[in-house]
C-alpha cells in the first residue's frame, strides 16, 4: 500500500514542503495586492511561466474528472499569485452541464461559486479564485475554441489560469495527464516556436482541426506539484481507502474502450497518410527525406504500444504475487 502511494507521488513528482517552510499554504495578502496593483502581466503576455498545485487539489481535480466518465466536468481552483507563478492550494467542483465535447457554466454554477468563496472567507480562508479546470476525456490537454473564449473572458477580470486534465490518459498511463494554459491578448502575435516536436501530443483526428485552429492563441505553463506535512497524512488516509482498488484494477480493462478508440483513430490516420502519399506519387511530387506526418503517426503507435505493454506487465506482476494465495487454506479445510 505504501509502495503504491510512493509510486504515485514519484510518477507525478510531488515534492515535500518542509513544515517550517509551509509558506505556500499561507495567503500573502500584501504580495497579492502589490502584484495586482502593478499588473505586470498586462505588459508581458508571457509573464506567468509556472503553476504549483497542491497534492490534495490535484487529487480532487483528478477524481472529479474521472467521475465524469466520457462527459466533461468543470471546477474552480483557489490560491494566489506570486511573481511569475500561480499557487493552487485547493479546488472545488461546479454544478455544470457537460457533454462529450464541451462544458457550460450556467447561472446556478455562478451562484454556487460566489456562495462557496464567500463561505471560505467567512471561515478565514482568504484565497481567491485563480483559475478554472475542466476535463478532456481521451483527447489530451489543450484548449478548444470554446475554452479559449472562456479563458479570454476570465482573464479580463485579472490573473487567471486554465487547467485541463485527461482522465482516460491518466488511468492508461498511470500518471496525471495535465496541462495549464493562458491565452494571449487579441492584438498580440506570438513568435513561432523553434521546435514543435517538444510539445507534441497525440490529438484524435476528430479534434485535430479544432486543436490546430486555436493552438497559436495560448501558451502552456510549467506544472509542478507540492505537499505539506498535513498533505502527507491526508494522502495516507486516502491510500488506506483506495489501495484495494489500486491492486485489483487493471488499466487494460478500466480503459479498454479508450484503447480501442485510440487504435481506431490511429488506423484512420494511417489510411489518410497513405492516400496522401499515393496522390503525391501520382502527381510526380518529390519525396521529402523526413515525412513529419508519418513520424507523428509512428509516435502515436509507439505510445499506444507502451501503454498496453505497461498494463500487461502490471497484470503479470500481480499474478506472480498473488497466484496460489488461499489454496493452502482450501486444501486444509478439505
Swiss-Prot record:
CDD domains: MPN_RPN11_CSN5. It is an enzyme of class 3 (hydrolase). A motif (JAMM motif) lies at residues 134-147. SUPFAM superfamilies: JAB1/MPN domain. Gene3D superfamilies: Cytidine Deaminase, domain 2. GO terms for cellular component: COP9 signalosome; cytoplasm. It is found in: Cytoplasm; Nucleus. The keyword Chloroplast does not apply. The JAMM motif is essential for the protease activity of the CSN complex resulting in deneddylation of cullins. It constitutes the catalytic center of the complex. This is COP9 signalosome complex subunit 5. It comes from Aspergillus fumigatus (strain ATCC MYA-4609 / CBS 101355 / FGSC A1100 / Af293) (Neosartorya fumigata).
Amino acid at each position: 500500500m505504501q509502495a503504491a502511494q510512493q509510486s504515485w507521488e514519484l510518477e507525478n513528482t510531488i515534492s515535500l514542503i518542509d513544515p517550517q517552510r509551509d509558506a505556500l499554504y499561507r495567503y500573502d495578502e500584501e504580495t497579492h495586492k502589490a502584484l495586482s496593483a502593478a499588473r505586470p502581466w498586462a505588459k508581458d503576455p508571457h509573464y506567468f511561466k509556472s503553476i504549483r498545485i497542491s497534492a490534495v487539489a490535484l487529487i480532487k481535480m483528478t477524481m472529479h474528472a474521472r467521475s465524469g466518465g466520457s462527459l466533461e466536468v468543470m471546477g474552480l481552483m483557489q490560491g494566489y499569485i506570486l511573481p511569475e507563478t500561480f499557487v493552487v492550494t485547493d479546488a472545488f467542483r461546479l454544478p455544470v452541464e457537460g457533454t462529450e465535447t464541451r462544458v457550460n457554466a450556467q447561472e446556478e454554477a455562478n451562484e454556487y461559486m460566489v456562495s462557496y468563496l464567500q463561505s471560505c472567507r467567512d471561515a478565514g480562508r482568504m484565497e481567491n479564485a485563480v483559475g478554472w479546470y475542466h476535463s478532456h476525456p481521451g483527447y489530451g490537454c489543450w484548449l478548444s475554441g470554446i475554452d479559449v473564449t472562456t479563458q479570454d473572458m476570465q482573464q479580463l477580470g485579472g490573473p487567471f489560469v486554465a487547467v485541463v486534465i485527461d482522465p482516460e490518459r491518466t488511468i492508461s498511463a498511470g500518471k496525471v495527464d495535465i496541462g495549464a494554459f493562458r491565452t494571449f491578448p487579441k492584438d498580440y502575435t506570438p513568435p513561432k516556436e523553434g521546435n514543435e516536436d517538444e510539445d507534441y501530443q497525440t490529438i484524435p483526428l476528430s479534434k485535430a482541426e479544432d486543436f490546430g485552429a486555436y493552438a497559436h492563441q495560448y501558451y502552456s505553463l510549467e506544472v509542478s506539484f507540492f505537499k505539506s506535512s498535513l498533505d502527507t497524512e491526508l494522502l495516507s488516509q486516502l491510500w488506506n481507502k483506495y489501495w484495494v482498488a489500486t491492486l485489483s484494477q487493471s488499466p487494460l480493462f478500466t480503459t479498454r474502450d479508450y484503447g480501442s478508440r485510440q487504435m481506431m483513430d490511429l488506423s484512420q490516420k494511417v489510411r489518410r497518410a497513405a492516400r496522401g502519399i499515393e496522390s503525391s506519387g501520382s502527381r510526380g511530387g518529390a519525396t521529402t527525406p523526413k515525412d513529419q506526418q508519418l513520424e507523428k503517426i509512428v509516435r502515436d503507435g509507439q505510445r499506444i504500444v507502451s501503454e498496453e505493454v505497461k498494463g500487461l506487465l502490471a497484470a503479470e506482476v500481480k499474478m506472480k504475487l498473488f497466484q496460489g494465495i488461499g489454496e493452502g487454506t482450501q486444501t486444509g479445510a478439505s
